[in-house]
Amino acid sequence: VKDGELKILVTPSKAFGKVIKMQLRAVREAHFLTFEDVDYKGDANMVGERNWSSLIDSQQYGGPLLYPKNNQLYNWSDANNTFLASELPNGWGDYQYWGGGHAISNYLDMDLTHGDFQHQLAVYYQDAKTGFGGHNGSKNFCVHYGYADNSGYANGPLPYIYFGDGVARVVDHMYVTMTTYLANCVANGNGLTAPAGKDDWVKLVAIGYDEDGKEVATRPEFYLVGAEGNILEWTKWDLSALGKVVKIDFNVTGSNDNGYGFSQPAYFAYDDVAVRF
């Protein structure tokens, strides 16, 4: 066995001297973070329920979970499965979603006129068979919001996922796509940003940290907007180049700048995160 690959030479008795070469690839065990209730394996979550759907806020903006008045920290954990977890970072001196974070969602909206912050948790995708917005026809997914750049206006902590048990593992991949808010602004712009032109781009960046808290060498990138077009369907983002990490920060950056830094909405949706075990 070498590099995860097993080669076997087989000479069947009726092959008349021919050698049949078979190549088998060893398959690593993987656990998947799907955000679907049927796959929830943890204890009670922050609202006392044992499912993912109870972590979806009742309002996309200003709701009681992501913008609490009681200082309750929005958080989630995929305990006893991938062990991935997340909570809102302290982006603006508090722990609310306007400072960034990763929010569970099942909202979808195919109407670009709704592409604003009031609909910030909606994905711009609807499965033709199920009618749901998640990857592979599923209901639930997660929405990232937050960024940092060199403008001096956005330099707070980035939203992140981490392994709640402190064990470093390889996050193999996740599936990503646009939110309705980003899709609208890329196509039409708004009061804060121009639409994306033919040479503009928006990309996602993953920043990994090892068990010693040191950043790993490689930063995988994924272009939501770029020369090859706009990503409007769930698409695989390979994160395996990070290697074994205990934490991953995510950033959204791009070429549009309104004089105050990156001006497109710093959102993306992700689903079906694969972790090697």
Give the residues covered by each predicted segment.
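C-terminal edge beta-strand
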Residues: 18-28
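Short surface loop/edge beta-strand patches of beta-sandwich-type extracellular domains
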Residues: 158-164
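Short coil-to-beta strand junction motifs in C2/discoidin
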Residues: 185-204
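Short, solvent-exposed loop/turn segments enriched in Ser/Thr/Gly
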Residues: 2-7
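N-terminal targeting leaders for non-cytosolic proteins
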Residues: 29-155, 166
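Extended extracellular/luminal ectodomain segments enriched in beta-structured repeat modules
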Residues: 166-173, 244-245
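Terminal, low-complexity interaction segments
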Residues: 12-16, 198-277
